Every structure is written in structure tokens, then in C-alpha cells.
């Protein structure tokens, strides 16, 4: 009996995350080759896994538009003609040491979004127990995608990886007299506002129980 039969929603490494992710990338490749809009969004601390690099390069060559937020190491070089010209890699290193991993495939209402504990590294995908799970709620899925828009709008800390391995500081392109937009500061302010609104309305948050045994929290 396969390991996947034990799970309804979870994708669990080392057996499931990489194959399922490659399947999702293949789905976007099929769309691109058919002349349909195809997109991949990824947020990871690093990308060093050869299989993922080769698969994303294949997707780029097929015409899939790929945008990646990679805070640290990237062994994938974007903007190489004929190979990775459809890949954009940016990095935001600011006040918050972010560790969230997001993997999204598709365009518009057909976008599928996964959150994960796994970076795009061989040690995470092939040698550790890691998990990935889909964001099925439409409102939450939209919120995650809006997060990407916010981060990519950063003009204070965003740096873009070039094909020669250097980074371009986008803050240098902010018009004189205009304050740079700091995405992390913006998200912090949003969190404070949401917390104040929750307190004012008496909103309570759900508590979790062990589904296997039931009971009360």
C-alpha cells in the first residue's frame, strides 16, 4: 500500500512533495504549449535541488511565466536566453526573517496554492519528513496570492537576481521625493489593524482538537 493512501490532503516528503510538484509544473507546461496562460509562483528560502531547477527550466522554455521569491541561495539563474528567460527571481531581506514556503500554479480562478514546510532543496525534498498542503478556501487562497502582489511591489528591500549572478536593488529606481514601499512594514501594519478590529468586535479564534480522538481543547 502506497504512503499516499494514508493522506487525504497532505503531501509528505520524501515520497510525495517533489513528484506532486513536478506534476503541477507539467500541468503548466501543457497549458503553455497549447497557447494558454500558464504561471508559477514560488516562495522559498532557497532553491538548490537539481531536479527542481531542471523542471523549472523546462517550464520556462515552454513559455510558462515563473516568479520566485527566494530569500537566500538560488542555484537557478534567471534570464538566460533560450533557457530561463521566463523566470524572475527576487529576494526581500528585511526586518522579518521569513520562513513561509508558498507554491502556486495557474492563473485566475484556476490557481492552486500550496503551503509547505519544505524548501526547494534536496535535503528537504528527498531526505527529510516535510509536508505540503493545499489552500482550498477561496478567500484564503486569494489572501496568499495578494501577499505575493504586496511583496513584489516592494521598492525598499526588493532585489532582483540577474543572469550574471548579481542583484539589482530596485530601491535605486524609486523616483526622487517618493518614499520607498516596504512590504514587510505594510504587512505588520495590516496585522496590527486586524488585531485591533478583532478585539473591538470580540472576535474569537477557533481552537484545534485531535480529530483522531475527539474531545474538547
Question: What is each residue range found by the language model?
Answer:
Residues 2-7, 14-217:
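PLD/PLD-like phosphodiesterase catalytic module centered on the HKD motif
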